[in-house]
Amino acid sequence: GLYLVSGNHSAVPEGVGSLQPPVWGLDSLLPAMPDPQGHAVGIEAPGGWICRISPDGKDWTMVASGFRNSVDLAINREGELFTFDSDLEFDVGSPWYRPTRVNHVTSASEFGWRAGSAKWPEYFADSNGAVVDIGPGSPTGISFGHHSNFPDRFQDKLFICDWTFGTIYTVDMEESGSSYVGTKREFLNGTPLNISAMRF
């Protein structure tokens, strides 16, 4: 099938099936504080989402949600899906700031992005955590190296692009339970080096 990734401002189209139960109520104990800059005020769950689409385009199924603004996907040799999700620059310095991060997109996963202070912390049992936090930036392209012409040591690395700081990182991943933990390393940077996409 095909995959479509969409940011937090994109509504889920009508008729889309879901692997998740649609229980996206903002049912926090304390009321959420909206973004003081007005970003995403009134935008409610599920936030950004990923759908699997049949080759004929007729059947859409949401496989994961709770993203801020992922713009690309990568699939490893085992067929597992990953994305590089955005932060919200207005949140830097707030207790609910969530850095850009690499996510392992498992079936029916929820990553807990909500507007303002309502983001789910990683310790919530039903919120998937990140493989690795990257920090402030603007995620764009993401690709595994197994179709590149790089030397063998790069073939299984995940390459991620940051437009803001003109940086390409590599991420090494180790299995951790049913997911992964990662370590980032700067691969290339420059000024300007505004990378918007990457494919090998």
Identify the meaning behind each predicted range.
Residues 1-200:
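Beta-propeller domains with acidic blade repeats across secreted/periplasmic ectodomains
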